Amino acid sequence: MITVPVVPAATEYLYRQATAAGIPLSGTFELTPVCNMDCKMCYVRLSRQEQEAIAPLFGAEQWLKLGRSAVDAGMLYLLLTGGEPFLHPEFRQILEGLHRMGLFISVNSNGTMIDETVVAWLKNCPPVRMNISLYGASDQTYERLCGNPRGFTQVTKAIRLLKEAGIQVKLNCSLTPHNAADLPEMVKFAQENELILQVATYMFPPVRKDSAMIGKNHRFTPEEAAYYMAYADYLTLGKERFLTQEGKIPTPSDPEEGCQGDGIACRAGKCSFWVTWQGHMMPCGMFPPEQGPNVFRMPFQDAWEQVKQDSAAVRLPPECANCSAKNTCRACAAMVVTESGCFHKVPKYRCDMIHAYKAQWDRVKEEML
């Protein structure tokens, strides 16, 4: 079973070149915070009434104008996300217009709004990939975690329709105490459907939705998160590959340049950006949005230059730079700021989780083998 997407060498080359040149190769447009589900751990979700009380949504004309400006600046890869992007009133016009620009477009969706009519339309402007969230293996779990008593039925139908239409699907699983018992069945579902399933047991604190949630979420304890990280490795990798890990967290085959504890080590703010539903450009979607320039009120290139400068100025905890686990922990700037409220304090939850991994890997090995 493939557990992570395979990135072509040409794509990696483009990212390296764009990082060196400061070109915004990759972008994310967060079209709306509105979602028809209410997942307990979500960092952005608002109801329609909550969204309207804050600000109106930007329309297709504005998003397409932004898309053209981003393309002119070098953007080639684009992720459309939300909330649930299919709930944007002009989502079809947005996707069709961006598709005509020749972009490699991926779409994040919970899958519940994708039916035969939607798939017939998508076949005319197909994304290169649909990233579908899989939150459980039963309608009961979806109701418990997401407040949707028909969620699993809807999502599995969407996945079947997308596959039949020849549209690539990747499954993302956010694992929490509310759906952990379903993990074996979710892995089995992915295997039977020959799909990538990427399991995350670390949940970012939802500080964008509630500033009082620094260091908190509806999530596992650090030790539980480490256990389920190891358990997910066992289920997805298989016995032999799991044992070859010897309790070590796999290191990326092509790690990012830079060093954690120094500056931002990922591509955020170097060759990638995120635009929130209110128009704030940020290095990534987990950063506090009020700090980012508004791309609907200033030229795209000016906003990008500001984000690059702000990102370059970020310095992470020096303790992380000297930590023996830094290459496997990969505590990014977003983790640091959402766990601690600033960039110079160690993200204790993440730190505890990573340092607990070996003992929890041993526990999984003992239980499973």
Segments the model singles out, each with a brief description of its role:
Residues M1-R129, Y228:
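Conserved alpha-helical substructure of the radical SAM core
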Residues I2-L14, I23, G285-L369:
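Flexible mid-to-C-terminal extensions adjoining Fe-S/redox cofactors in radical SAM and related proteins
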Residues T19, G261-C266, S311-V314:
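Short Gly/Pro-enriched turn/cap motifs at secondary-structure boundaries
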Residues V34, D38, C42-R45, G269, ...:
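Cys/His-rich metal-chelating microdomains
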Residues D38, G74-M75, P126, I167-Q168, ...:
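Short loop/turn motifs at secondary-structure junctions
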Residues R48-L57, R144-R150, I214-G215, T338:
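Short glycine-enriched, charge-decorated loop/helix-capping segments at active-site entrances
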Residues F58, P89, R150, H178-A181, ...:
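Residue-level signal for the nucleotide or nucleotide-sugar donor/cofactor binding architecture
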Residues V128, S133-Y135, Q140-G269, W274-M282, ...:
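Radical SAM enzyme [4Fe-4S]-AdoMet core and its adjacent flexible, acidic
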